[in-house]
């Protein structure tokens, strides 16, 4: 009986030993697998950045962090056919002091060469604010793309298109004039904003934009560019890329159905797509952002997710030496649907329309 017990004990020890041996083997295999997986991810990450990383001197005026600025507050708006209601001198000054002193932005983008943009430049000059500007030349529709733009329900009348061509020439002359008058503040000029994509309502022919770019380049000393969606650049850019001084791309993962867990990786894929087409072009990201509220996106839009995308993407582009204009500084409630204040177009800012900071920058304000 005693020998039988000893035999049972020996058998149990053997089984335990075998089980422990199997566990050790599984652990070793798991560690090796994790190591190989991590190494693969790192190698893929390095591979991604090898095709995208730029030289330090590719940064616009040496800045990686920049921001899009449009100062329209509640009750204010640009010209929508019945005249504009612009911010006051004091309001613009308040905004620029927030951006330069509280958030340390020293490079902003403005979208047109109208009265409001001239005011922004004058406020910077007269108050000696440490901010440089990418000036915009806004182009109106010269083609009716009512078949591809979802909110154009009927063709744009031909007489309106002809009038727009004249107004575009006037806008170009204004842009040239402002760039030359404020040559110490304006560091680049952008001709047309999302005027090349089929889905927008102010489409202009590519050859026409090339002609406009060449005209502006002959008249100013600053760099000249055209800003549009990354996909347009990846698919259609061959001729335009030859005449601009750098390529300006827009990236919005959330508009393409992505949630925050894919925000950074999808943005990198967008840039890779552009780089494959024009590998030697200097790239500036002139719009990238994440809304804090949007009925269109449901839970994909939130202040926390905006904060995460801002921190991840802006850090990554800094490492890549890519100047990135975050879209945007302040919410603008004049945009989008007038009867729905929860629309995405109204909620891209780091601040609300009332100039209250969102989660994305509260930590920065405490630090500063």
Which ranges hold each PLM region?
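C-terminal motif of bacterial Sec signal peptides marking the signal peptidase cleavage site
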Residues: 28-30
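Substrate-binding cleft of extracellular glycoside hydrolase catalytic domains
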Residues: 119-222
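Aromatic-rich peripheral "rim/lid" segments of glycoside hydrolase catalytic domains that contact
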Residues: 40-58, 62, 299-302, 316-368
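Aromatic-lined carbohydrate-recognition surfaces of secreted/lumenal glycan-active proteins
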Residues: 213-235, 281-289, 323-333
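Active-site clefts of carbohydrate-active enzymes
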Residues: 197, 201, 251-255, 277-307, ...
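Conserved, mostly hydrophobic/aromatic
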Residues: 108, 189, 247, 285-287, ...
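N-terminal carbohydrate-binding/catalytic regions of secreted carbohydrate-active enzymes
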Residues: 62-148
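Aromatic- and acid-rich polysaccharide-binding/catalytic face
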Residues: 135-137, 146-148, 187, 193, ...
């Amino acid at each position: 009986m005693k020998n039988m017990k000893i035999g049972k004990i020996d058998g149990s020890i053997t089984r335990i030993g075998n089980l422990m041996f199997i566990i050790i083997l599984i652990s070793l295999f798991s560690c090796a697998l994790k190591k190989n997986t991590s190494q693969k991810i790192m190698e893929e990450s390095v591979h991604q950045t090898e095709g995208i990383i730029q030289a330090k001197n590719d940064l616009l005026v040496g800045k990686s962090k920049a921001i899009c600025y449009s100062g329209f507050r509640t009750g204010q708006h640009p010209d929508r056919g019945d005249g504009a209601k612009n911010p006051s001198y004091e309001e613009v000054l308040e905004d620029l002091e927030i951006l330069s002193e509280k958030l340390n932005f020293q490079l902003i983008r403005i979208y047109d060469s109208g009265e409001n943009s001239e005011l922004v430049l004058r406020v910077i000059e007269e108050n000696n604010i440490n901010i440089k500007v990418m000036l915009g030349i806004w182009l109106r529709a010269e083609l009716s793309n009512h078949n591809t733009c979802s909110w154009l329900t009927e063709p744009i009348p031909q007489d309106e298109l002809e009038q727009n061509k004249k107004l575009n020439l006037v806008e170009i002359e204004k842009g040239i004039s402002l760039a030359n008058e404020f040559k110490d503040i304006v560091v680049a000029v952008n001709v047309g904003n999302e005027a090349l994509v089929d889905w927008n309502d102010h489409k202009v022919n590519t050859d026409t934009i090339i002609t406009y770019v060449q005209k502006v380049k002959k008249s100013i000393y600053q760099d000249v560019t055209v800003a549009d969606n990354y996909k347009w650049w990846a698919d259609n850019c061959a001729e335009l890329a030859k005449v601009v001084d750098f390529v300006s791309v827009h990236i919005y993962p959330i508009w393409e159905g992505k949630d925050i867990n894919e925000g950074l990786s999808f943005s990198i894929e967008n840039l890779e797509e552009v780089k494959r087409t024009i590998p030697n072009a200097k790239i500036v990201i002139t719009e990238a952002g994440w809304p804090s509220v949007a009925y269109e996106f449901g839970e994909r839009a939130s202040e926390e997710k905006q904060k995460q995308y801002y921190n991840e993407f802006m850090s990554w582009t800094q490492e890549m030496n890519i100047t990135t204009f975050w879209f945007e500084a302040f919410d603008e409630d004049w945009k989008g649907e007038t009867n729905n204040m929860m629309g995405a177009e109204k909620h891209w800012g780091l601040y609300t329309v009332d100039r209250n900071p969102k989660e994305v920058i509260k930590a920065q304000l405490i630090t500063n």
